[in-house]
Swiss-Prot record:
GO BP: any one term: purine nucleoside catabolic process
Binding positions for a purine D-ribonucleoside per the UniProt entry: 4, 162, 179-181, 203-204
Protein name per its UniProtKB record: Purine nucleoside phosphorylase DeoD-type
Catalytic activity, reaction form: a purine D-ribonucleoside + phosphate = a purine nucleobase + alpha-D-ribose 1-phosphate; a purine 2'-deoxy-D-ribonucleoside + phosphate = a purine nucleobase + 2-deoxy-alpha-D-ribose 1-phosphate
Encoding gene per record: deoD
Length: 234
């Protein structure tokens, strides 16, 4: 048990999926896991452990933003020995060829700042995914026939941005989408020699203004969860 996770050490699997939304964690566990049991509800941040095709997996909510994710990822790694951490969540599309409902598999995550920024000082550390997980996710996405993009994303530290020039530079440099957590997850995984990946569903588009209707989100997000689970145990 930690400050933010109330589970016993034996209740958390070595493979953890991390949606930001705790209700999405509950939905994913009920939909895709066998024998899912609630293992955490501290501060309403729900976590469940069950099995997927015989493999033990935990789905733990992480909240919004890098500071929140950093708390849960740190505790999962240091106190529960999590070895594989996969963020599953939504993002905003940034490139014209990236459409709402598409899935982005994040090869790298650019950020201006993160909870780890103070460690690097003048160094611009490049947070990247674990290659084996990345390759397995691409294979799983192709097998499902899911429209998928692989490349860099932008992890912002604000949701209501006041710097449109930053978005312009991200688009100019080929960034596929924007979210708020992956850069810190990749940094922590590198520091602790763990496997990490972010798989994201494009729920809205910054250029077109298109947004995914609420009734379509469940099925679209389901593709993302299945890709993550298949990649984790490939």
């Amino acid at each position: 048990m930690t400050i933010h996770i109330g589970a016993r050490p034996d209740q958390i699997a070595e493979t953890v999926l991390m949606p930001g939304d705790p209700y999405r964690a509950r939905w994913a566990a009920q939909t895709f896991l066998d024998g899912a049991e609630l293992v955490n509800e501290v501060r309403g941040m729900l976590g469940f452990t069950g099995t997927y095709k015989g493999n033990r997996v935990t789905i733990q909510g992480s909240g919004m933003g890098m500071p929140s994710l950093s708390i849960y990822a740190n505790e999962l790694i240091s106190s529960y020995n999590a070895q594989t951490l996969i963020r599953i969540g939504s993002c905003g599309g940034m490139q014209p060829h990236v459409a709402v409902r598409d899935v982005i598999i994040a090869m790298s995550a650019t950020t201006i700042t993160s909870p780890s920024s103070g460690i690097f000082r003048e160094v611009n550390f490049a947070p990247t995914a674990h290659y084996d997980l990345l390759a397995a996710a691409v294979t799983a996405a192709k097998a499902k026939g899911t429209r998928t993009h692989v490349g860099g994303i932008y992890s912002s530290d604000v949701f209501y941005a006041e710097r449109p020039d930053l978005d312009e530079q991200m688009v100019r440099h080929g960034i596929l989408g924007v979210e708020m957590e992956a850069a810190e997850l990749y940094t922590l995984a590198a520091r602790h020699n763990r496997r990490a990946l972010a798989i994201l569903t494009v729920s809205d588009h910054l250029q077109t203004g298109e947004a995914l209707p609420a009734e379509d989100r469940e099925q679209t997000f389901g593709d993302m969860v299945e890709i993550a689970l298949e990649a984790a145990f490939a």
